[in-house]
Amino acid sequence: MDFHLSKEHLLVRKMYREFAETEVKPLAEELDEEERFPMETVEKMGKLGMMGIYFPTEVGGAGGDVLSYVMAVEELSKVCGTTGVIVSAHTSLCAAPIYENGTPEQKAKYLPKLCSGEWLGAFGLTEPGAGTDAQGQQTFAKQDPETGDWILNGSKIFITNAGYANVFIVIAVTDIVPDKKGRPTKQCSAFIVERTDPGFSVGKAEDK
């Protein structure tokens, strides 16, 4: 097996490295000191195709591969951990679930905006009393029998990109059933929640 990068991947890495050095690194210290979210950098990365690297062009992506995506996150994280995590949470935890599991209508609605950087994505699992233990979470979802809409009730914490995200993948309990030993087990589902949905709000940023 050849572990050397292809010429194409070397060129891609060079492009990401130059972007990281010129556009991201100069802001890194300022972002940490001021606890500021680099929305201007997100917009630039969107124009460069970095917010949807390995998604096909048919859904608005750059048409690259996973290795190119990994190299992008690596180069960004070398100079600014904040920016690397912004891209990885947006891509792996929000855009990817929609691409892999969404309906054709959901893909058409969300992926072009996510891949272009017009919209930012986030993922909500962690809770105040449960951490990232899905079985311990207290966010529940119930379906309205008349409208068919799902109503979510609960709170999440430590959600990367939450302050600026337009769309969230939120994990909620939809049923409780016995396991093989008769113990109650929570069944969880992933929901697409938009920032503008009724009843949704984002709390103050944590002092980190």
Where are these regions (language model features)?
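Amphipathic, small/basic residue-rich leader segments at the start of a protein or domain
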Residues: 1-87, 106-109, 113-116, 143
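Conserved G/P- and acidic residue-centered "switch" motifs that form tight phosphate/ATP-binding loops
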Residues: 49, 103, 154
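Short, solvent-exposed loop/turn elements at beta->coil junctions and helix N-caps
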Residues: 58, 125-130, 157-158, 205-208
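N-terminal glycine-rich flavin-associated loop
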Residues: 85-105, 131-134, 143
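A short, Trp-centered hydrophobic/proline-enriched beta-strand micro-motif
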Residues: 117-125
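Cytochrome P450 C-terminal beta-domain/meander region
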Residues: 133-153
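Flexible, small-/acidic-enriched active-site or ligand-binding loops
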Residues: 136-138, 198-208
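A short core secondary-structure module
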Residues: 149-203
